[in-house]
């Protein structure tokens, strides 16, 4: 029985540790990206006006450092009871957040793995449920975690981990990320990044038309729109996503001539030879 517990505990520990380390690292090397994701959460709960940008940036660095450090503590069995309890608290909070995201969908991507891996809210919730169960197992039997370093050396590893992950965040903040998972990373082929593979799932929409007749406003769909009744006056339209399809890594790139309003995207991307662009926020 003890052998079964040992195997179960250490498998749960490895799953949690590797997930925390990977998740914390990919967010730590892109602190600005993590800041933007925090801003999305604050916007969803209408608190963005109360939290300044510099606070969001500090939060992004601190949260990624905590997650990465917790993963190393679990991997090396540093402070087994403490790390197990903190991981349970952390996963309880994250599971509650992703449950809210799954039900309400105020944000399409939780950002748990930065730009490295994108999961749907439902996939993230299932992932967090599995990790929550793993954390419960560790809290129940913390002493079955096998140590990799002695008690006297565990604090050396702990402090080294904190210094390492904080330095990684600072270096990535002032320079390019060590590993760049962003859509516009150096060497990216923008044209290929915008392509949709053949046979890829298409996004399906529900289009609603708002029309007015004799002071009465009514909504129509594409199926029952009064095409042959000219007495209905079109007022507005809106679209609702019924099922999300494939979205290319680069889906928001465009170049427009401000003077003429012409779209120059295709002409520039399809031009032979080199194209040099000077981009400046302030002219």
Residue ranges of each PLM-predicted region?
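C-terminal TM-helix exit segments that contain a strictly Trp-centered aromatic cap at the helix terminus
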Residues: 22-30, 93-105, 169-175
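Internal/C-terminal transmembrane anchor helices
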Residues: 148-185
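Short active-site neighborhood of thiol/selenol oxidoreductases, capturing the structured segment around
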Residues: 265-283
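N-terminal "domain-start" segment that seeds a small globular fold
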Residues: 177-267
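Membrane-interface helix-boundary motifs at transmembrane edges
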Residues: 2, 76-83, 143-154
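Functionalized membrane-embedded alpha-helices
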Residues: 6-28, 56-97
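Membrane-embedded alpha-helical segments of integral membrane proteins
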Residues: 92-145
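Solvent-exposed, well-ordered loop and adjacent helix/strand elements within mature globular domains
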Residues: 23-63
């Amino acid at each position: 029985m003890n052998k079964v517990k040992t195997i179960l505990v250490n498998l749960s520990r490895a799953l949690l540790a590797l997930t925390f380390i990977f998740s914390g690292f990919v967010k730590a090397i892109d602190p600005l990206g993590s800041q933007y994701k925090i801003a999305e959460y604050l916007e969803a709960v209408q608190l963005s006006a109360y939290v300044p940008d510099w606070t969001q940036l500090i939060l992004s660095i601190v949260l990624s450092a905590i997650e990465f450090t917790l993963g190393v503590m679990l991997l090396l069995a540093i402070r087994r009871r403490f790390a197990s309890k903190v991981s349970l608290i952390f996963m309880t909070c994250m599971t509650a957040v992703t449950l809210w995201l799954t039900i309400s969908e105020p944000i399409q991507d939780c950002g748990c793995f930065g730009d490295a891996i994108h999961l749907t809210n439902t996939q993230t919730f299932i992932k967090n449920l599995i990790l929550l169960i793993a954390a419960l197992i560790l809290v129940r039997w913390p002493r079955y975690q096998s140590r990799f370093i002695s008690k006297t050396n565990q604090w050396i590893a702990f402090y080294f981990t904190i210094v390492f992950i904080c330095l990684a965040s600072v270096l990535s903040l002032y320079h390019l990320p060590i590993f760049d998972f962003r859509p516009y990373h150096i060497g990216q082929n923008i044209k290929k990044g915008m392509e949709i593979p053949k046979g890829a799932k298409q996004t399906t929409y529900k289009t609603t038309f708002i029309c007015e007749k004799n002071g009465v406003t009514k909504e129509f769909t594409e199926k029952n729109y009064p095409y042959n009744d000219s007495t209905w006056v079109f007022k507005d339209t809106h679209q609702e996503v019924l099922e999300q399809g494939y979205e290319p890594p680069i889906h928001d790139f465009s170049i427009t001539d401000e003077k003429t309003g012409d779209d120059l995207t295709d002409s520039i991307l399809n031009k032979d030879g080199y194209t040099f662009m000077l981009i400046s926020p302030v002219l």
